[in-house]
Amino acid sequence: MSTARTENPVIMGLSSQNGQLRGPVKPTGGPGGGGTQTQQQMNQLKNTNTINNGTQQQAQSMTTTIKPGDDWKKTLKLPPKDLRIKTSDVTSTKGNEFEDYCLKRELLMGIFEMGWEKPSPIQEESIPIALSGRDILARAKNGTGKSGAYLIPLLERLDLKKDNIQAMVIVPTRELALQVSQICIQVSKHMGGAKVMATTGGTNLRDDIMRLDDTVHVVIATPGRILDLIKKGVAKVDHVQMIVLDEADKLLSQDFVQIMEDIILTLPKNRQILLYSATFPLSVQKFMNSHLQKPYEINLMEELTLKGVTQYYAYVTERQKVHCLNTLFSRLQINQSIIFCNSSQRVELLAKKISQLGYSCFYIHAKMRQEHRNRVFHDFRNGLCRNLVCTDLFTRGIDIQAVNVVINFDFPKLAETYLHRIGRSGRFGHLGLAINLITYDDRFNLKSIEEQLGTEIKPIPSNIDKSLYVAEYHSEPVEDEKP
């Protein structure tokens, strides 16, 4: 029976007959991306939000045992090395090391335990400038380490002796807020006192008000909720020294721009503003001219699409789409896939069809209750299902590195939407596949998007070379490696 898991997370047809269902997917971590998460961590975030990093007592005792001169790196619990092939999107660096930035040892410990070995290009450009206190306007591709680029200097500049809010990260979606806050918590876990709070719409406002009675150093929020808390006098932002706008193009679109203007007006005049996005339309330029002071501009966008993502299209009629999808499922070696539809109704209908075909499937869209969205997001991220059907809710910043295939079941109308959709695969320089089901009515949009993005979307071949999107890799425990 294919009932939508909206009462229990949205899961469709987990059956042993499904050819893709070969046990849980192993999530992987990458610099600036998400890393692995457990449901226990999700519950901790959901129930406490203001977090004294659950592990900090352990972390403090750990840091106190390290004496000057000790090789502190030997105490680290490093994840297995990710030996997958990476593209120049993340490997084309200047050769810097995280130690070159004179970061606190406790912060370095968190960085290395995330599996972040060396800074990516956006991190190399961003970290030293952000540490100097200068405003930044940064363009970088999706999935190249933007989160680490701003979280590392943000955490380094915290004064843990003070008990006020010192930094804010504003993101456009609730799922992205939870993801960024979890990364922040993990990176800062050895800092012994860094308190991170995630606050988003769709959660209990009273709980957030109570949490703000305690010490909070970093707030990661969606725009409407944090403005509400500021106006109520609960979130006191008169000591905020840094504000980050992640996915700035979305935050400064018509939906949010007035809210963002109102938030900025509540902050101290000498605050530092960091803007990060893959695209910067006119609205971002206008905001920059009004609020940023001599910003340092970073542009790592020689081309818009990720080098590791191969793009194909298949011409179909509307009635042929499900059959074509079934063929793709049977022929592709999918680790995890994200399938995009253009409406919530079509998401649910397609998820039901996929279930009937015998494949495991979650679905998620903006009309679902927040707690159900949270469960679907974290269950999919933890590899409990191979396929996720969704709307464009899932296009912004979401980092699930096990995803190697993105399918546009419904082709988008805007180049910006297309860019963010296909950026869900090929994360952090890895390989991925984007397949577009194109109807007669989509043909002009296809041509237009190719021209706007300066990319080539090829006709799908009868056989797709697995080396384009399947990462055959082996992870070995770090302690087994020889110097």
From Swiss-Prot:
GO molecular function: ATP binding; ATP hydrolysis activity; cadherin binding; helicase activity; mRNA binding; protein domain specific binding; RNA binding; RNA helicase activity
InterPro entries noted in UniProt: DEAD/DEAH_box_helicase_dom, Helicase_ATP-bd, Helicase_C-like, P-loop_NTPase, RNA-helicase_DEAD-box_CS, RNA_helicase_DEAD_Q_motif
Expression tissues: Abundantly expressed in most tissues.
Domain Helicase C-terminal: 308-468
Subcellular location(s) of the protein: Cytoplasm, P-body; Cytoplasm; Nucleus; Cytoplasm, Cytoplasmic ribonucleoprotein granule
Effect the entry attributes to changing residue 386 to E: Abolished ability to regulate RNA metabolism
SMART domains registered for this protein in UniProt: DEXDc, HELICc
Impact when changing residue 331 to A: Abolishes interaction with EDC3
Reaction(s) this enzyme catalyzes, per UniProt: ATP + H2O = ADP + phosphate + H(+)
Modification Phosphothreonine, positions: 36
EC number in record: 3.6.4.13
Residue ranges of the region described as RecA-like domain 2: 307-483
Keyword Nucleus: yes
Motif range (DEAD box): 246-249
Top EC group: hydrolase
Sequence similarity: Belongs to the DEAD box helicase family. DDX6/DHH1 subfamily.
Function, as annotated: Essential for the formation of P-bodies, cytosolic membrane-less ribonucleoprotein granules involved in RNA metabolism through the coordinated storage of mRNAs encoding regulatory functions. Plays a role in P-bodies to coordinate the storage of translationally inactive mRNAs in the cytoplasm and prevent their degradation. In the process of mRNA degradation, plays a role in mRNA decapping. Blocks autophagy in nutrient-rich conditions by repressing the expression of ATG-related genes through degradation of their transcripts.
Subunit structure: (Microbial infection) Interacts with rotavirus A non-structural protein 2; this interaction probably plays a role in the sequestration of DDX6 in viral factories. Interacts with rotavirus A non-structural protein 5; this interaction probably plays a role in its sequestration in viral factories.
PANTHER family: DEAD-BOX ATP-DEPENDENT RNA HELICASE 50 (PTHR47960)
Disorder named in the UniProt entry: Intellectual developmental disorder with impaired language and dysmorphic facies: An autosomal dominant disorder characterized by intellectual disability, developmental delay, impaired language development, and dysmorphic features including telecanthus, epicanthus, arched eyebrows and low-set ears. Additional features include feeding difficulties, mild cardiac or genitourinary defects, and distal skeletal anomalies.
Name used for this protein in its record: Probable ATP-dependent RNA helicase DDX6
Gene: DDX6
